[in-house]
UniProtKB/Swiss-Prot annotation:
InterPro entries: AAA+_ATPase, DNA_recomb/repair_RecA, DNA_recomb/repair_RecA_CS, P-loop_NTPase, RecA-like_C, RecA-like_N, RecA_ATP-bd, RecA_C_sf. Can catalyze the hydrolysis of ATP in the presence of single-stranded DNA, the ATP-dependent uptake of single-stranded DNA by duplex DNA, and the ATP-dependent hybridization of homologous single-stranded DNAs. It interacts with LexA causing its activation and leading to its autocatalytic cleavage. One of its GO terms (biological process) is DNA repair. Pfam families: RecA, RecA_C. Its main location: cytoplasm. Keywords: ATP-binding, Cytoplasm, DNA damage, DNA recombination, DNA repair, DNA-binding, Nucleotide-binding, SOS response. This is Protein RecA. SMART domains: AAA. Residues 337-347 have a biased composition (Acidic residues).
Length: 347
């Protein structure tokens, strides 16, 4: 860059800093690049699939799927993980359907959980914005986008046609929220429902769509599609669901990874079940017939017994988890190492 351009840029930068504050504009090289903080989901498989060890702080996340697929369970487990690390959690219950007893079973400290059950969509999003701007919330869940009913719709008559009202509300709210979410380093999770598109469909196009317009699709850094794909039985009794979670969008790591995990009724995502599945895949857990062994020690006949053994021996489960993390977690290069590799590749 020639000297005249450098001087003009320097004047412009100093003027911007004077008007908008220090750090309003900066060179990327001047800024220390830090790893994105993440809150674990309670599912080791999903944490590894997300590529950063969980859901990213300072970002918007959308979790969607059919009814009873495990959307709220997943968010409550993330809240429990956050609280274990001393974080503060808030739950905006627009559906007025949160079960505190179930939340407690999943490990949520219900006494410390901030709960709001707003009357309108505007009220819900205004409360969310105020809590985010306080800078004291680590994770916030909004359940759900479909239940964020605009005030005009609530005050109107049944059958009134108000097209695009909720989509406009979401678009306006996200424009306002996103900057505050980044500044306060809060993880904000929107739970969303699926609807069927009405009209002519293109070949190969999915008839499913999420509610609340397209704004959330663009603003979300991570989008998860969660679906029940089967039942888990103990004899004739159904004790849980086999669930597939697909990372549909990920701005922080490669997307389109998917995991199949187990959600047990009254317990949530089966940590021990995941450890066994991943252990067998990584050849850390041996499976001979119906027997499972780890470290030369038999841990159970049948998956249910092996799961119970790991639950009764948490030190063994912790050791297996540490071994799996060592095997599956990507190693991070320092910036200098990364630069050297890039130079070598270029040569």
């Amino acid at each position: 860059m020639d000297e005249n351009k450098k001087r003009a840029l320097s004047v412009a930068l100093s003027q911007i800093e004077k008007q908008f504050g220090k750090g309003s504009v900066m060179r990327m090289g001047d800024r220390v690049i830090e790893a994105v903080e993440a809150i674990p989901t309670g599912s080791l498989m999903l944490d590894l699939a997300l590529g950063i060890g969980g859901l990213p702080k300072g970002r918007v996340v959308e979790i969607y799927g059919p009814e009873s697929s495990g959307k709220t369970t997943l968010t409550l487990q993330a809240i429990a993980q956050c609280q274990k690390k001393g974080g503060t959690a808030a739950f905006i219950d627009a559906e007025h359907a949160l079960d505190p007893i179930y939340a407690g079973k999943l490990g949520v400290n219900v006494d410390d959980l901030l709960l709001s059950q707003p009357d309108t969509g505007e009220q819900a999003l205004e409360i969310a914005d105020m809590l985010v701007r306080s800078g004291s919330i680590d994770i916030m869940v909004i359940d759900s986008v479909a239940a964020l009913t605009p005030k005009a719709e609530i005050e109107g008559e049944m059958g009134d046609q108000l097209p695009g009202l909720q989509a406009r509300l979401m678009s306006q709210a996200l424009r306002k929220l996103t900057g505050n979410i980044k500044r306060s380093n809060t993880l904000v999770i929107f739970i969303n429902q699926l609807r069927m598109k009405i009209g002519i469909m293109m070949p190969g196009q999915s008839p499913e769509t999420t509610t609340g317009g397209n704004a959330l699709k663009f603003y979300a850094s991570v989008r998860l599609d969660i679906r029940r794909i089967g039942a888990i039985k103990k004899g004739d009794e159904i004790i849980g669901n086999q669930t597939k979670i697909k990372v549909v969008k990920n701005k922080l790591a490669p997307p389109f990874k998917q995991v199949v995990t187990e959600i047990l009724y009254g317990e949530g995502i089966s940590r021990e079940g995941e450890l066994i599945e991943m252990g067998v895949e990584a050849k850390l857990v041996e499976k001979a017939g119906a027997w499972y062994s780890y470290g030369g020690e038999r841990i159970g006949q049948g998956k249910d017994n092996a799961r119970g053994y790991l639950r009764e021996n948490p030190h063994l489960a912790a050791k297996l988890e540490a071994d799996l993390r060592e095997k599956f977690e990507p190693t991070e290069l320092s910036r200098e190492e990364g630069d050297e590799d890039t130079l070598e590749d270029a040569m």
